[in-house]
Amino acid sequence: MGLQSAAAHFINRFIIWITIFMVACFLLRLLVVLDLNKRVYNHTPGPCRVLTDNYKGTAGMTYVESQKRVYITLGYGRAHDLKTKTGIAFYKTNRTDGRSQQEMYDLIEMTINWNGYEYKKEFIPTGIDSYSSSNGRVLLYVINAHPNHQCIHFFQIVESSKLNHRKAICDPSFSSLQDIAVVGPDRLFVTNMAAFGRGWAQILEFSLQTGQGAVYYYDGSKLSTAASSLIAPTGIGYDAKRRILYVGSMIRESIFAYKVAKDTTLELLYEMMLLTSPIGVFVESKTGDIWIAAHPVIHESAWHYTHPENQNIHSPSQILRIRIQEEGNSWVTTEPYANDGATISASSSVVFTDEQMLIGSSFGRLLHCDLTHSYIT
């Protein structure tokens, strides 16, 4: 009887110590994820200016080289119960078209012909990408972040500042759509960050790092899972020349590189550790350089996202540039821009072209910077 009692006592103590060890590991991982030890030091690549702060969010951007335009989604804050106008606008990057100094920094809002779409009032655009055909046709693909109508919307630019709504793809698996990367006409990848859309359930999911995120592929007729069991996938970008898909992970603070096969299946090539949480990804078509809009201090970002209406709560912003070397398996990372959140809070999108950089934010303004300090870019 004494031997059985001793064995039971040992088992109980063993279970207790294992439980303490697991809790300690969880707390340690949580502390690392929260970035409690990080600070942000402000710097810019050149003179910067605010293009607009009239909308609660400029969360997504895409560059159409044939038009010299950056298309921008407006009003993401409405998905977090902020009162704001939503829509799509564009910014002209061409500075030699005879416009005045003031006109060079204007945003032009687009009108949308919804063609009878039933839920047009629930349109909250966030992630956006584009496709340009050889005959000059430009298509836009936009994610709707409305909590009850998460869909992918298909548009065609029919006039200079008008959009024609073609269709919408919705699916029960769309719980927290984040970003979109187009690989062909009506062929695209999207990231779904988590099993839960928001709230404490999503926070718990991130804390446990359960890996419920996914990348979905739409081939023009049906939806399929391209990559599963991902931890908080966010921004996504496609390098058409190398056929590489880049997927950011907010919690792992890294970028995954996938080779896109001819049948559009994905093969994981490598993971690039960033030590910051990537939110938006932009790939330069000419160089293949990767530009990343990031949240460098995740606990401040989490507080900002749970209190977006509070103007006194900011989240730092950071832009990284990754230059992939010729051999393709090494890279150089620089930081062209960083801000403590006072100028632009929670950077979520970035575009670079013609020595101009545009930075969008989750709930606030759109920033434009001229890149004149080449030594930091």
Swiss-Prot record:
The name this protein goes by in its record: Mechanosensory abnormality protein 6
Q: Glycosylated residues?
A: 94
Q: In which tissues is it expressed?
A: Expressed in neurons including the six touch receptors, ventral cord motor neurons, HSN, PVD, PVC, IL1, and several neurons near the nerve ring, in the anal ganglion and in the male tail sensory rays, in muscles including the body wall, vulval, intestinal, anal depressor and sphincter muscles, and in the excretory canal.
- Any ranges marked Cytoplasmic in the topology annotation, and which? 1-13
Q: Which domain of life is it from?
A: Eukaryota
Post-translational modification (record): Glycosylated.
Sorted alphabetically, which keywords does the UniProt record give? Cell membrane, Cell projection, Disulfide bond, Glycoprotein, Hydrolase, Ion channel, Ion transport, Membrane, Neurodegeneration, Potassium, Potassium transport, Sodium, Sodium channel, Sodium transport, Transmembrane, Transmembrane helix, Transport
Biological source species: Caenorhabditis elegans
* Cysteines engaged in disulfide bonds, as pairs: 48-369
Chief localization class?
A: membrane
Task: State the taxonomy lineage.
Answer: Eukaryota, Metazoa, Ecdysozoa, Nematoda, Chromadorea
